[in-house]
Amino acid sequence: YDDKNGINTTIKDGVTLGDPVGTKVYEDGLNNSATTENSLLKSLGITNPNNDAYTVSFDKTITTTTEKSNGQTITYSYNESGTILTAKRTDEKTVFTVELKKDASGKDVYDFQLKEAMDHEYGNNGKNDFDLPFKFNVTSNGMTSDNKTFNVTVVDSVPNAKDKTVTTNEDT
């Protein structure tokens, strides 16, 4: 309240970008359609206390990654609104998709789906994973935020070296 002019004002908080939640996906999940370990929904960390209108979109200036799949370069393309990123190899196979969307409760999430195995460097002190960073922003009331980044860690499907007993039946 402004005593001098008799004016009441209300300050409204707008859309706020918190910290997005990173996640891990496992290439082992590519071999078993019953598993969901290669497709995950995680929070973008957006709060909107006053239900302001806003849009979320990827930074569409990022068009490639240094990572590869089957020895091939991976390039990114986006839908018109910038909410779906599709990563394809040189041979046009889709390696993964990432979608910015609302979950069933209305919260902003990203949906990462790994479709093809990615190349990993071996002998890196047992490290068989790497991070894929994704940048996004929010536009509200004509203003676009700075980019925020979430990471998806891709874990290689490394076989376990264990003793196994195998029985074979031969013709007699």
For the regions a language model picked out, list residue spans one by one.
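Acidic/polar, solvent-exposed loop/turn segments
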Residues: 1-172
